Amino acid sequence: MTELFIDGAWVAGSGPVFASRNPGTDAVAWQGDSASAADVDRAVASARRAFAGWSALDFEARCEIVKRFAALLTERKEAIATAIGRETGKPLWEARTEVASMAAKVGISIQAYQERTGEKRQDMADGVAVLRHRPHGVVAVFGPYNFPGHLPNGHIVPALIAGNTVVFKPSELAPGVARATVEVWQAAGLPPGVLNLVQGEKDTGIALANHRQIDGLFFTGSSDTGTLLHKQFGGRPEIVLALEMGGNNPLVIGEVEDVDAAVHHTIQSAFLSAGQRCTCARRIFVPQGAFGDRFLARFADVTSKITADVFDADPQPFMGAVISARAAAKLVDAQSRLVEQGAKPIIAMTQRDPRLGFVNAAIADVTGVANLPDEEHFGPLAQVVRYTTLDDAIERANDTAFGLSAGLLADDPKVWEHFRRTIRAGIVNWNRPTNGASSAAPFGGTGRSGNHRPSAYYAADYCAYPMASVESTQLTLPASLSPGLHF
């Protein structure tokens, strides 16, 4: 089984066999040998050898290869979307949007490099000041399972454009998507060694993260893993560490005129991708009183009608399975712990089959829970908090170590002005779902949500370092010498 891509060739791994499974059917989706520490070492060495030639290649030549990658993604959209759906459980309609986002990322990344990290010149009295940007070298990219194509792509594309070479370690839950994506890069004409793929589980990831020949590590995933990486690289300023992690995101509901619109945006915020987006709303702040009661009743009514089904079902469902049966069981357990602490289920979550990843969208009123845990439950479990004043809602919304996304649904622009000035998050939306984001804008947060803005416009910033030069085409003795110098 040749499932590793090293030095431009598909090769067999020498580590243990592992498999990914379709969470909606439990069928094996992919199987192969993992990369051992020796395989990882070969991949890093390959990337190191390729770095000099790739970084010396003309910027436009690098961009042409990346543009071919985007064109081929569009050609292979259905096949890649099917791979995404099979391994993640997300419906095909949503998987197709992920592939489209992967292709769109290329143009945005090229524009970002030119505007944020390109070359700038300024004349001086005795020469010219030049600002250039240089690639770091060999970077490790760790991808998540929820967007196994789009999110690693948000690191890989800007890294390659800047002239870095890459060793890619995808999630062990979505290796087939990684294989399909790297095949597109290969078809686009990427030179050997520029992008290497190491498949595997925890041991493969540890071997790559601990490798002394990487110059940077770009990670999208859980806050727990990201925090461990942050600790690991403490005291190593030579490593560029870019982290995009999770959030315990708040959505504050105001007394709006259009209740159905508010319910729609709340459902999109909480349950899109079966709640498996880092920007999904985890805490829904609803006003006390008659309006809040009416909103909650409608929210529960529409939520109760949401069905989850296999990724290729016809008609297509709003939600698919979560990533695994284990993840589904953890969500049900999280709900049970909240109930033990005083939460009141409005719609209780159940796991349809212990072998599968299907859970229903759930709502729990946690207003009465003292010391509500500051945790990200990565799935369709919405926690409702009733509030009395907007300032009360904002204070409680900010009571988190995370700071990824936040949203406000309100008709009054003055309420929005107050909210955006006082809420703490990297993505703050008004009358839009919390998981709505522009690829042309920074994507990321504060606190435990990360330290950079990966997977969007600002990714160019951590893919290259600035090099400042003062230059003159002629070497001449200055007309005026410093005191104490005699020629």
Swiss-Prot record:
The protein's matches in Gene3D superfamilies, at most eight in alphabetical order, are given as: Aldehyde Dehydrogenase, Chain A, domain 1, Aldehyde Dehydrogenase, Chain A, domain 2
Which residues participate directly in catalysis? E244, C278
* Stored InterPro entries: Ald_DH/histidinol_DH, Ald_DH_C, Ald_DH_CS_CYS, Ald_DH_CS_GLU, Ald_DH_N, Aldehyde_DH_dom, SuccinylGlu_semiald_DH_AstD
UniProt pathway: Amino-acid degradation; L-arginine degradation via AST pathway; L-glutamate and succinate from L-arginine: step 4/5
Q: Which UniProt keywords apply?
A: Arginine metabolism, NAD, Oxidoreductase
Molecular function as annotated in GO = succinylglutamate-semialdehyde dehydrogenase activity
The UniProt record lists the EC number as 1.2.1.71
Q: Which parts of the sequence bind NAD(+)?
A: G221, S222, S223, D224, T225, G226
Protease in keyword set: no
Listed under GO biological process in this entry are: arginine catabolic process to glutamate; arginine catabolic process to succinate
PROSITE patterns linked to this entry: ALDEHYDE_DEHYDR_CYS (PS00070), ALDEHYDE_DEHYDR_GLU (PS00687)
Q: Does the keyword NAD apply?
A: yes
Task: Report which reactions are catalysed by this protein.
Answer: N-succinyl-L-glutamate 5-semialdehyde + NAD(+) + H2O = N-succinyl-L-glutamate + NADH + 2 H(+)
- Pfam families from the entry? Aldedh
SUPFAM superfamilies on file: ALDH-like
* NCBIfam families documented for this protein: arg_catab_astD, PRK09457.1
* Family classification: Belongs to the aldehyde dehydrogenase family. AstD subfamily.
Function of the protein: Catalyzes the NAD-dependent reduction of succinylglutamate semialdehyde into succinylglutamate.
Q: What is this protein called?
A: N-succinylglutamate 5-semialdehyde dehydrogenase
For this protein's source organism, the top of the classification is:
Bacteria, Pseudomonadati, Pseudomonadota, Betaproteobacteria, Burkholderiales
